[in-house]
């Protein structure tokens, strides 16, 4: 039986600001990308999210970011690579400690937003992220993988460093012909119809391709499928994807 992981971003509330319906999504997905306080989330929310994920048997990943609360991590920051490495280590260490308190572990790392897109091609920043993961793995005996865009430079560097890699596709995002994501600033970058998105995911998993924004077919490999938790109708979207995969005989299972 074919299997695939379904992941979603969670723990993105902080202080009095609330985002997403994490509790509902945890009943649907198999992996949770938990914000680590740099683009969203705080100590309380991180704890609540890890506890709930553990109770639902959902795999926990660290959703690390540039230090950009004001911009929700969507702004590129030309940060010194050494500082970026240390800030990723900081985020990983915080989430690992909080997860451990709730009887869980952090199994993978998924960079967020602008950082995610930048390390597809930015040598110095991609290297810094890989070094951070490898440093924590080496110091603690952990075996965290990195989850990223297929063909991304960061995945190549991770493999060279001996860090496990996982590739993902986005259920509700449009793709360019080169396999990169269409900028959110461009019209049509985010898909909103649950039925359309669900069919698209089945094609991705069974045929290994996605239709780009210009209509061309792009070969793409996916260990995991991301459904965004902060978009309108996120729960309905995730439910439609899960149900359509199940009806096709595809089993949902955490990749990490």
UniProtKB/Swiss-Prot annotation:
Q: Which UniProt keywords apply?
A: ATP-binding, Hydrolase, Nucleotide-binding
Keyword Hydrolase in the entry? The reply is yes
Q: Does the keyword ATP-binding apply?
A: yes
Q: Which InterPro entries match?
A: Glyco_hydro/deAcase_b/a-brl, LamB/YcsF/PxpA-like
| Reactions this protein catalyses | 5-oxo-L-proline + ATP + 2 H2O = L-glutamate + ADP + phosphate + H(+)
A biological-process GO annotation: carbohydrate metabolic process
**Its Gene Ontology molecular function terms?**
5-oxoprolinase (ATP-hydrolyzing) activity; ATP binding
> What does the function comment of this entry state?
Catalyzes the cleavage of 5-oxoproline to form L-glutamate coupled to the hydrolysis of ATP to ADP and inorganic phosphate.
Q: Which HAMAP family match?
A: PxpA
Q: Which family does it belong to?
A: Belongs to the LamB/PxpA family.
Question: Could you describe the subunit structure of this protein?
Answer: Forms a complex composed of PxpA, PxpB and PxpC.
> In its UniProt entry, what is this protein called?
5-oxoprolinase subunit A
């Amino acid at each position: 039986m074919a299997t695939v992981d379904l992941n979603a971003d969670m723990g993105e509330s902080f202080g009095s600001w609330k985002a997403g319906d994490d509790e509902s999504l945890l009943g649907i997905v198999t992996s949770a990308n938990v914000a680590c306080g740099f683009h969203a989330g705080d100590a309380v929310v991180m704890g609540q999210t890890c506890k709930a994920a553990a109770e639902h048997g959902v795999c926990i990943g660290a959703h690390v970011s540039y230090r950009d609360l004001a911009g929700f991590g969507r702004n590129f920051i030309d940060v010194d690579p050494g500082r970026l490495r240390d800030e990723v280590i900081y985020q990983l260490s915080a989430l690992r400690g909080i997860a451990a308190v709730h009887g869980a572990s952090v199994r993978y790392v998924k960079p967020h937003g602008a950082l995610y897109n930048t390390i597809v091609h930015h040598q110095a920043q991609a290297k810094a992220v890989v070094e951070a993961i490898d440093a924590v793995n080496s110091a603690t005996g952990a075996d965290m993988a990195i989850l990223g865009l297929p063909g991304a430079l960061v995945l190549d560097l991770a493999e060279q460093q001996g860090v496990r890699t996982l590739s993902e596709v986005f259920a509700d995002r449009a793709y360019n012909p080169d396999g990169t994501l269409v900028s959110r600033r461009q019209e049509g970058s985010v898909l909103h119809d649950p039925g359309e998105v669900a069919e698209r995911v089945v094609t991705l998993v069974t045929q290994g391709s996605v239709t780009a924004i210009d209509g061309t077919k792009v070969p793409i490999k996916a260990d995991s499928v991301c459904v965004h938790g902060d978009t309108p109708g996120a729960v309905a979207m995730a439910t439609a994807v899960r149900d359509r995969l199940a009806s096709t005989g595809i089993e949902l299972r955490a990749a990490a």
